[in-house]
């Protein structure tokens, strides 16, 4: 491990003997392959994300929180090639750390049901990969994780049941918008979420969709 990685781990107390009840997670979203040159994008991700999480002494959960793709692509395209290479590297890292990988569906016009390409990873017995395209809870190392992809036409009653009628949970990962994150709270056909929607969440809410790093209400990232 090089010195820069070691300093980062010390700063965040990422040690092997960290409390076993703490879930160590890595998140990324809105990669939008191939909005930029996909070969260049892959190299940037390898250097700035993949190598860093691979070097972590402990890692329990890796999440791609929506919009891996920018638009519907042909399977023979460079965009699909490099997106798939990126996912393959995530799978390798997941396996080497005995972690879990969650690929969350994002905006329909972007991901366009293309996460199906990675369903085959869920058939493997040697690595834990989950492709999530509907609202549900996932158990990861004794932690209850609420997964909310971007969906349309879901009755509000169903959201209320999941958010308030399903007991406490430890973490929420989602693709969507929290009130105040975008000007005018314009969410199109999606649902606008509010902080009070997550009263049952005992940990952070980590979302993709808005392309600007920010923290809202000290819990929503």
Question: Which functions belong to the PLM regions below?
Answer:
Residues 36-40, 66-91, 105-125, 214-220:
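Metal-dependent catalytic neighborhoods of phosphoester/phosphodiester hydrolases
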Residues 1-85, 89, 159-168:
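N-terminal active-site segment of His-dependent metallophosphoesterases
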Residues 141-198:
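Binuclear metal-dependent hydrolase catalytic cores centered on His/Asp/Glu-rich metal-binding motifs
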Residues 29-36, 59-79, 100-113, 169-170, ...:
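Active-site neighborhood of divalent metal-dependent phosphoester/pyrophosphate hydrolases
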Residues 5-17, 85-153:
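Extended active-site neighborhood of metal-dependent phosphoesterases/phosphodiesterases
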Residues 31-33, 173-177, 203-213:
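Histidine-centered catalytic micro-motifs
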Residues 184-221:
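Conserved beta-sheet core of the metallophosphoesterase superfamily
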Residues 16-26, 137-147, 166-171, 218-220:
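Beta-strand-turn-beta hairpins that frame and shape the catalytic cleft
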């Amino acid at each position: 491990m090089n010195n820069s990685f070691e300093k980062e781990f010390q700063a965040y107390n990422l040690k092997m003997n960290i409390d076993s009840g703490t879930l160590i997670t890595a998140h990324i979203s809105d990669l939008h392959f191939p909005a930029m040159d996909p070969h260049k994008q892959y190299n940037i991700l390898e250097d700035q994300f993949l190598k860093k999480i691979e070097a972590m002494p402990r890692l329990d959960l890796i999440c791609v929180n929506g919009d891996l793709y920018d638009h519907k692509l042909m399977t023979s395209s460079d965009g699909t090639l490099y997106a798939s290479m990126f996912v393959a590297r995530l799978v390798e890292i997941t396996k080497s750390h005995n972690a879990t990988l969650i690929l969350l569906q994002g905006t329909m016009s972007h991901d366009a049901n293309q996460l199906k390409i990675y369903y085959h990873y869920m058939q493997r017995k040697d690595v834990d990969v989950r492709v999530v395209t509907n609202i549900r809870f996932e158990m990861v190392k004794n932690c209850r994780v609420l997964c909310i992809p971007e969906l349309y036409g879901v009755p509000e009653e169903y959201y209320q049941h999941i958010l308030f009628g399903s007991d406490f949970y430890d973490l929420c990962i989602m693709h969507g918008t929290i009130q105040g994150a975008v000007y005018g709270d314009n969410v199109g056909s999606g649902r606008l979420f509010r902080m009070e929607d997550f009263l049952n969440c005992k940990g952070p809410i980590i979302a993709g969709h808005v392309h600007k790093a920010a923290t809202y209400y000290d819990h929503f990232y």
